[in-house]
Amino acid sequence: TPAEAFPNTQAKLASFAAGKGTILFFEDMDVVRSLQEQFALYAENFPIWSDQSTGIAQHAVWVALAEANIGANLQHYNPIIDEEVAATWNIPANWKLTGQMPFGSIEAPAAPKDFMDDADRFMVIK
């Protein structure tokens, strides 16, 4: 983080630390490599499918927390924190950290976000 932006980053990290906990998401890259070897025709797709699978898992956990009225947000401080996380929790070297989800009480509603119009990003083809 550039020095001029660090105060904002520090405040954000403090808000995560004030939560009840953080869920860490990992992908076992040995499994991905094994599937690449077993199904060589699709080898280049397995890292992509791995990313998609972790995205689905992250979304499912977020939805489950939201349904329980627990606030959460998804963060990606990789690779900055990878070594520290692995050392702190004795994470196997073949596990790739893919995301962090701090969770806790909902202190305020989420701020509104601007999104691209659905008509510009979604197509129905008949």
Label the model's feature ranges.
Residues 35, 85, 119-122:
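Generic structural signal of hydrophobic/aromatic residues within well-ordered alpha-helices
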